């Protein structure tokens, strides 16, 4: 991570940290860096989610891109993976998405995709950061024919929808409940599943600029659970604000998280001989029950740090085609280059239709261990050094010895906040509480702050 770019682009409170001025510079400097690696005038797709600040930042970003001669195709409201797909399929130079994903409406973010559809690599981000930190803007200022052009490109959304439909199966007779989080999926999910022939019940489909992710979507699936129970839907599908995540709900209203979704898709691909190297890429946060289920099926795991960026890096480096996170980021590399909630939803319903099994039956093969996570506020300077504190190291070793292999402890720093995260999994809630609370008490006593 750099000074401006985190693991998922540049983020901050809109108009306070992520200002129009910064958005203009990101467009201008980002566009210039991209143009230095292109033989022709770059063509860049720009999309956004439904946040009230989206149009403000979009206008500033596009102005910056145009100022260095970039040709811009404005997609409007579209899922983040829709931008990634269109960049690659239409051979654009790059894509930019304006979104803060599952964060509340006051936040926003800007992330770049390279011409290959993957998030911009660290070297390109560092080139942009160097220009942001320069004392003077010395970039060329073309005039007249040297300026970029702007094209409204709403057909991009429809092309993305049609592509996702092409990867699925006819769903006639299946009742599907959707929660589009008042976000980017509100412009596409209904159409995708209508085209597949599903009977639909939809919530979280009325964005007003302020209600994105507000008590709806993958981080607040309670409303969808209730809708599924009341409507008798066969499955509920909850997306986050930019639709790069999916959390599902079975026909009984029970949650099916990213671990279970990855297992279902992974087992399906494995049985067809289509799971690359018979391996799923996951993170250190995946549940122990998920690991045990994969072991039972003979499916291998590759484990990375938390963050879909690291999952994708491992998949690309090692040639894997399925990976993801417990939070609902699922990357199916045969179809797209990044986590895609709507694509994952189409594949999940496809598996249900093809196997004739209910979602509860498919998900029941993974027994999730009770898990507890506690965040402890610490000084930023200490969060990466916690494991060097003797008392903390000692208590973790003591708790792991008590587990005797039937559980898991993970203590890690937050990548974005001054927090130390203490997580444990064990066969019972009582055991989990004991392990986490015991470790957390020691951490607070040693390095915690109010």
Swiss-Prot record:
Family matches, as Pfam families: PGM_PMM_I, PGM_PMM_II, PGM_PMM_III, PGM_PMM_IV
Residues the record lists as Phosphoserine modifications: 101
Keywords from the named record: Isomerase, Magnesium, Metal-binding, Phosphoprotein
BP terms from Gene Ontology: carbohydrate metabolic process; peptidoglycan biosynthetic process; UDP-N-acetylglucosamine biosynthetic process
SUPFAM superfamilies cross-referenced by the UniProt entry: Phosphoglucomutase, C-terminal domain, Phosphoglucomutase, first 3 domains
GO cellular component: cytosol
EC number: 5.4.2.10
Alphabetized InterPro entries for the sequence: A-D-PHexomutase_a/b/a-I, A-D-PHexomutase_a/b/a-I/II/III, A-D-PHexomutase_a/b/a-II, A-D-PHexomutase_a/b/a-III, A-D-PHexomutase_C, A-D-PHexomutase_C_sf, A-D-PHexomutase_CS, Alpha-D-phosphohexomutase_SF
Cofactor: how and how many bound: Binds 1 Mg(2+) ion per subunit.
UniProt-annotated binding residues for Mg(2+): 101, 240, 242, 244
Active site: 101 (phosphoserine intermediate)
CDD domains: GlmM
Cofactor: Mg(2+)
PTMs per UniProt: Activated by phosphorylation.
Disulphide-bridged cysteine pairs: none
Superkingdom classification of source: Bacteria
Catalytic activity entry: alpha-D-glucosamine 1-phosphate = D-glucosamine 6-phosphate
Enzyme class: isomerase
Listed GO MF terms: magnesium ion binding; phosphoglucosamine mutase activity; phosphomannomutase activity
Family: Belongs to the phosphohexose mutase family.
Family annotation (PANTHER family): PHOSPHOGLUCOMUTASE (ALPHA-D-GLUCOSE-1,6-BISPHOSPHATE-DEPENDENT) (PTHR42946:SF1), PHOSPHOHEXOSE MUTASE (PTHR42946)
Biological role: Catalyzes the conversion of glucosamine-6-phosphate to glucosamine-1-phosphate.
Identification of the protein by name: Phosphoglucosamine mutase
Species of origin: Streptococcus gordonii (strain Challis / ATCC 35105 / BCRC 15272 / CH1 / DL1 / V288)
Originating gene: glmM
């Amino acid at each position: 991570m750099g000074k401006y770019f985190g693991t998922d682009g540049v983020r901050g409170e809109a108009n306070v940290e992520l200002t129009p001025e910064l958005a203009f510079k990101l467009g201008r400097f980002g566009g210039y860096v991209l143009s230095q690696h292109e033989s022709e005038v770059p063509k860049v797709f720009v999309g956004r989610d439904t946040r009230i600040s989206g149009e403000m930042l979009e206008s500033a970003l596009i102005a910056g891109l145009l100022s260095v001669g970039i040709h811009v195709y404005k997609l409007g409201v579209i899922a983040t993976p829709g931008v990634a797909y269109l960049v690659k399929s239409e051979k654009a130079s790059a894509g930019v998405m304006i979104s803060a994903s599952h964060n509340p409406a006051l936040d926003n973010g800007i992330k770049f995709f390279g011409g290959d559809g993957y998030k911009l690599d660290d070297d390109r981000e560092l080139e942009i950061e160097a220009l942001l930190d320069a004392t003077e803007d010395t970039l060329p200022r073309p005039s007249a024919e040297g300026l970029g052009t702007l094209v409204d490109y709403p057909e991009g959304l429809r092309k993305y929808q049609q592509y996702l439909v092409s990867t699925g199966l006819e769903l006639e007779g299946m009742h599907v409940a959707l929660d589009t989080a008042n976000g980017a999926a509100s412009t596409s999910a209904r159409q995708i599943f209508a085209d597949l022939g599903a009977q639909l019940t939809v919530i979280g489909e009325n964005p007003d600029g302020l209600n994105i992710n507000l008590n709806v979507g993958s981080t607040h699936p309670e409303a969808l659970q209730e809708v599924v129970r009341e409507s008798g839907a066969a499955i509920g599908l909850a997306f986050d604000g930019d639709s790069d995540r999916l959390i599902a709900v079975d026909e009984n209203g029970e949650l099916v998280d990213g671990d279970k979704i990855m297992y279902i898709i992974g087992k399906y691909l494995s049985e067809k001989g289509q799971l690359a190297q018979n391996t799923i890429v996951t993170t250190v946060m995946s549940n122990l029950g998920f690991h045990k289920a994969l072991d039972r099926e003979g499916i291998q795991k590759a484990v990375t740090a938390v963050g879909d960026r690291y999952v994708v890096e491992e998949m690309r480096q090692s040639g894997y085609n399925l990976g993801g996170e417990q939070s609902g980021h699922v990357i199916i590399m045969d179809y797209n280059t990044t986590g895609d909630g709507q694509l994952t939803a189409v594949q999940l319903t496809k598996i249900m239709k093809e196997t004739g099994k209910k979602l509860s039956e498919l998900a029941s093969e993974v027994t999730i261990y009770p898990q507890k996570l506690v965040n402890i506020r610490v000084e930023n300077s200490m969060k990466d050094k916690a494991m060097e504190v003797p008392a903390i190291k000692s208590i973790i070793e003591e708790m792991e010895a008590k587990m005797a292999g039937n559980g898991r402890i993970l203590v890690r720093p937050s990548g974005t906040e001054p927090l130390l995260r203490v997580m444990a999994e064990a066969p019972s809630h009582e055991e989990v509480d004991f392990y986490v609370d015991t470790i957390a008490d020691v951490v607070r006593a040693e390095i915690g702050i109010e």
